[in-house]
């Protein structure tokens, strides 16, 4: 596999990513928004205090015994700790998968230590002619102080690009690959038509990446995609991302207002 450093862009020298706090700098100056951050600003935040209390009561009620407020507090803390541990483990495993795919594309190295990597290999077998262009590409829009990292960029024969994000998640599709579009609550302002779920947020991320590449890098992005790779499933699931032009323009406009 060819080293994809041959496709460097002049902007690559200007952007720096801090792994510890997941922040970006452009020419040494901190940017205001990551792609995920500007999106999260327009959706309800998960109230862990409230929902952990609800789950603690459910857990104790299931036992069919009376309990003290101290026992309720203890159970609530245990649930919060369980959530944090699960989140940390998922993040670590997701990072390992991303690194394994990057190693494959940049060094030709394969691994059998990550179960879901075999699904990525199945994807490659189905599309053997796709041309890799960049992995883990950090991109930015200096005018609006936004930056993010695209997991994978492929190139068509006509020069157009198409982008992928790898998702090691069970929140995007069910066991037969149907997209989970829960609509418990919705976004704010001009995103009030967008339900608050992982699928919609990832679609907005992809649309922002497309905007950044086309407006700042002189590229044409022909399609946006998510590839779900999780050991719970029997195979990979490929999700094509729709164009959300109006919503993307809104996010860019709000970012610009805060920068100015």
What role is predicted for each listed range?
Residues 1-2, 9-14, 106, 142-143, ...:
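Accessory terminal regions of nucleic-acid processing enzymes
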Residues 30-37, 114-117, 196-197:
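Secondary-structure junction/capping motif
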Residues 36-40, 169, 242-248:
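A short, sequence-level motif marking secondary-structure junctions
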Residues 195-260:
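Metal-dependent nuclease catalytic regions and adjoining charged, substrate-binding loops involved
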């Amino acid at each position: 596999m060819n080293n994809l450093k041959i496709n460097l862009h002049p902007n690559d020298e200007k952007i720096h990513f801090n792994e510890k706090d997941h922040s970006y700098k452009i020419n040494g100056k901190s940017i205001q928004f990551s792609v995920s951050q500007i999106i999260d600003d327009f959706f309800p935040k998960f109230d862990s205090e409230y929902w952990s209390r609800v789950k603690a009561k459910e857990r104790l009620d299931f036992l069919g015994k009376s309990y003290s407020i101290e026992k309720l507090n203890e159970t609530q803390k245990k649930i919060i700790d369980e959530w944090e541990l699960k989140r940390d483990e998922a993040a670590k495993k997701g990072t390992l998968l991303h690194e394994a795919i990057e190693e494959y594309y940049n060094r030709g190295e394969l691994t059998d230590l990550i179960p879901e990597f075999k699904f990525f290999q199945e994807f490659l077998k189905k599309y053997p002619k796709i041309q890799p262009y960049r992995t883990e590409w950090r991109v930015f829009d200096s005018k609006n102080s936004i930056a993010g990292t695209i997991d994978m960029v492929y190139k068509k024969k006509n020069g157009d690009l198409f982008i992928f994000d790898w998702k090691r998640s069970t929140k995007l599709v069910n066991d037969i690959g149907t997209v989970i579009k829960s609509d418990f609550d919705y976004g704010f302002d001009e995103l009030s038509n967008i339900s608050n779920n992982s699928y919609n947020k990832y679609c907005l991320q992809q649309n922002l990446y497309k905007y950044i590449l086309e407006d700042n890098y002189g590229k044409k992005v022909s399609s946006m995609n998510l590839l779900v790779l999780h050991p719970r499933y029997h195979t990979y699931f490929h999700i094509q991302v729709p164009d959300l032009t109006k919503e993307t323009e809104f996010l860019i406009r709000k970012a610009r207002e805060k920068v100015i």
